[in-house]
Regions:
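Histidine-centered active-site/metal-ligand motif
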Residues: 54, 58, 202, 252
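Short solvent-exposed loop/turn micro-motifs enriched in small/polar/acidic residues
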Residues: 4-7, 227, 235-238
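A domain-level signal for the structural core that forms small-molecule/cofactor-binding pockets
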Residues: 255
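Charge-rich, well-structured scaffold segments of protease-associated domains
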Residues: 8-10, 14, 25, 69-225, ...
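Active/ligand-binding-proximal structured segments within catalytic/core domains
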Residues: 18, 25-76, 150, 265-277, ...
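N- or domain-start disorder-to-order transition segments that initiate the globular core
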Residues: 1-31
Length: 421
């Protein structure tokens, strides 16, 4: 078992062939955020099993070998803490936020959820209905649904384009055997990352994890398990437009293109460009589309970085009668940025804005926990905040021009509409 100090208050321990543990001590708070990331999610699903990772994430809360669903709910909430989970494209995560004195209880509950769910057929029928209602909620929320459609258009035949929730048909067909097979295949220490941030030392975290049997070496023999491999991502569909009809007050439009993976250093240039393009009230899109033309209330740029690929784009909601005008104006702004990039004072201001946002985003233990876990689950070596700030500061005009020309080219964008005909 090897422990490395990554920064003044940040440490990482890697068990040979086993779990990765990271922590950041924040002595000024009285709480700890702690989570377990399972490196298996929708990117690992074949189409017929779409949604199985998300359904399993729900089902572990229905009961374990030691706790009922109500006992799980009360275990931390009764102490003022919180317990939650989510499924992304790359990982399934379970996390808690508790008083520092309640960290042993939090780790016990999280371990119980990940290791010992009972996965009963009777619970599946109930929770299946809950997930079907979650799908209904997305379909009743057009500014969510349009993003689902955008991903499907980018990757129509790959799991990155599948709905994380699944479809009504796939969720309805999933069985407890499907859930148990996924749990046995993916939910084991060598496929997990554990991260904590707050008023806890790394030594204390390791002590508690040792008590929960997280620090043993990898299983051997017939029971040995290997982490499931994600399905390789094919090239995204670029430069196409898809229009979907729905009776809505607004037309919802997403521009999107594949970009760079989490570990790609070009992500810093993309973050800076996205900020300038649609990151706030001072951004080009906000000023042009909302302030100058009055075409939208919501207009913003977005970036997401996954283990294998990223997505960069723009969302706007506008009246059906102004949708064509809004799309044309956004394309004009894309063309300007792709052609000119960022230079001089504009680049200096954009760097300062991005650096400030990065620092402000880490003001809570939960945010620090998520950041720590992000490195191993996405395959990037640890980068200190100072290193990230330096990477942003070091961006050159040439780098910005290259990234802008490649990823903000209007001809590259896939555009998806959702609204009235």
């Amino acid at each position: 078992m090897e422990t490395v100090r990554l920064d003044r208050e940040i440490s990482q321990t890697t068990v040979p062939g086993g779990v990765v543990v990271l922590s950041e001590r924040v002595p000024s708070v009285r709480s700890v955020a702690v989570g377990i990331w399972v490196r298996s999610a929708s990117a690992h699903e074949p189409r017929p099993k779409m949604g199985v990772s998300h359904l399993l994430e729900h089902m572990v809360f229905k009961g374990t070998e030691r706790r009922t669903a109500q006992q799980i709910a009360l275990a931390l909430e009764s102490r003022g803490g919180s317990l939650d989970a989510y499924t992304s494209r790359d990982t399934t995560a379970f996390q808690a936020r508790v008083l520092d004195s309640d960290l042993p209880q939090a780790l016990d509950v999280l371990t119980d959820l990940v290791r010992n769910p009972v996965l009963r057929p009777s619970d599946l029928e109930l929770e299946r209905n809950v997930v079907l209602e979650e799908i209904n909620t997305v379909e009743d929320t057009p500014d969510d649904q349009v993003f689902e459609l955008a991903y499907q258009t980018l990757w129509p035949k790959h799991s990155y384009g599948y709905s994380i929730l699944g479809t009504r048909d796939t969720v309805s067909a999933l069985s407890t055997d499907d859930l148990k097979q996924l749990h046995g295949r993916a939910y084991f220490p060598a496929n997990c990352v554990i991260a904590a941030a707050g008023n806890v030392t790394h030594e204390r975290l390791l002590e508690l994890l040792g008590e929960q049997a997280w620090l043993a070496d990898r299983e051997t023999g017939k029971g040995k398990r290997e982490a499931p491999a994600a399905i390789p991502v094919p090239a995204a569909v670029r430069g196409t437009e898809a229009r979907h009809t729905k009776d809505t007050a607004q037309t919802h439009i997403v521009f999107a293109t594949d970009s760079v993976a989490y570990a790609d250093r070009r992500k810093y240039a993309l973050l800076v460009l996205a900020n300038v393009f649609g990151g706030g009230m001072s951004s080009r899109l906000f000023q042009r589309i909302r302030e100058e033309l009055g075409l939208a209330y919501a207009i913003y740029a977005f970036t997401s970085f996954y283990r294998q690929v990223g997505v960069t784009g723009v969302y706007v909601g506008t009246q059906p009668k102004t949708a064509v005008q809004a799309e044309a104006a956004i394309r004009e702004e894309y063309a300007k940025l792709a052609r000119a990039g960022l230079a001089g004072e504009a680049l200096a201001e954009a760097k300062q804005q991005t650096q400030g946002q990065l620092m402000l985003s880490l003001e809570s233990p939960s945010a620090r926990m998520y950041r720590l876990a992000g490195f191993p689950v996405h395959g990037e070596p640890y980068q200190s905040l100072d290193q990230v700030l330096a990477a942003v500061a070091g961006l050159t005009e040439e780098e910005m021009a290259t990234v802008a020309a490649e990823f903000f080219d209007p001809a590259r964008q896939t555009v998806v509409w959702l609204g009235k005909e």
